[in-house]
Amino acid sequence: MKVIVLGSGVIGVTAAWYLAEAGHEVIVLDRQPGPALETSYANAGQVSPGYASPWAAPGIPLKAIKWMLRRHAPLFIKPDGTWQQLRWMWQLLQNCTGTRYEQNKARMVRLAEYSRDCLDQLRADTGIEYEGRQRGTLQLFRTREQLDAALRDIEVLRFAHVPFELLPPSLLTKAEPALEHVKHKLTGGLWLPRDETGDCRLFTVRLADMAAARGVQFRYGQEISHLAIESGNVNGVVVSGVRVQADAYVVALAAYSVDVLKGVLDLPVYPVKGYSITVPIIDEALAPVSTVLDETYKTAVTRFDNRIRVGGMAELVGFDRRLSPRREGTLKLIVHDLFPGAADLSQTSFWTGLRPMTPDGPPIIGATPIPNLYLNTGHGTLGWTMACGSGKLLADIISGKKTDIQHDDLGIGRYAK
């Protein structure tokens, strides 16, 4: 079967890889001149299945107000009066119950754990290198309240058989030796030893090269306009004024999926703006060995080979991609606070990207009411974590194979209930 994949970020490229592996003829279309040049370009770099959690959680509305009042606020909302933003926030509020939080988190952990297994297998099969490390993730708490909140999530980890350790301040160096000098600032940490890190863009570029060697066609610089719908099916995608046709179509355009599907499907995905800095390491002994999550600032500090990436923040500002010097200052403060002397903060590469967020948390993967149209979008901050599992799952669905994990609760149909 001939399949067109719209989008060459980590989600689109992994889908293309697994579709080609399943024997399909695959064409990837993207407006950028190469792969992973938007949302996947400089994300936080963590592959953290155990920390897969929905934003919509009990108490979040009140916490959001408190966060926005902080000097280094992890959250900023700019109401724009659009129906899309208002509806998305209302749907998120409806998911802020204990029952829905547990349900959504379980769905996310299921997919994320599966995805990590798929990544492990892909690495074993191909030998792909992307500055990856298998050294776990450590979530740091600065208050007792944060620690107590994490204890409530542990039951989900137990249910999903995810190994973890709760570490007091004195044992944080078991996971991250460089925290020796700052552990007095912390109340403890939650360590997930099976989590991983890696450069998402490097992974995507190299996997795209491998996919091309398998026959996948990558057509860059293509302005994707809209889907041509005829007799209830997609009969082509209009690209740079030309209709390109296939048997099946996959939309993996992150937050921009909404525009392409306008008038075709009502997609509850909203762009949430995040930031990152990447800095060179000047003292390895003072640098992290893997990923550290700072619960206070809602950021991740991740180690690559010779670089540190600090990523996080959340802004609901539509498709505004302007860089904020204030956000850059906050990210620098975090890496200096936890790992002083580890990096050269005068050599900062500053970036912003738009994460495609669903109001309930899990991504939207699978079939749609249109028989030959499929979705692979809405992964939010967890695109890198969930990419391989999402791609493999989607390829199995399109191929009509029995899937390795339950997926009926990950589709677009869940919003019609």
UniProtKB/Swiss-Prot annotation:
Its EC number is 1.4.99.-. InterPro entries: DadA, FAD-dep_OxRdtase, FAD/NAD-bd_sf. FAD binds at residues 3-17. Pathway: Amino-acid degradation; D-alanine degradation; NH(3) and pyruvate from D-alanine: step 1/1. GO terms for molecular function: D-amino-acid dehydrogenase activity. Belongs to the DadA oxidoreductase family. This is D-amino acid dehydrogenase. It comes from Methylobacillus flagellatus (strain ATCC 51484 / DSM 6875 / VKM B-1610 / KT).
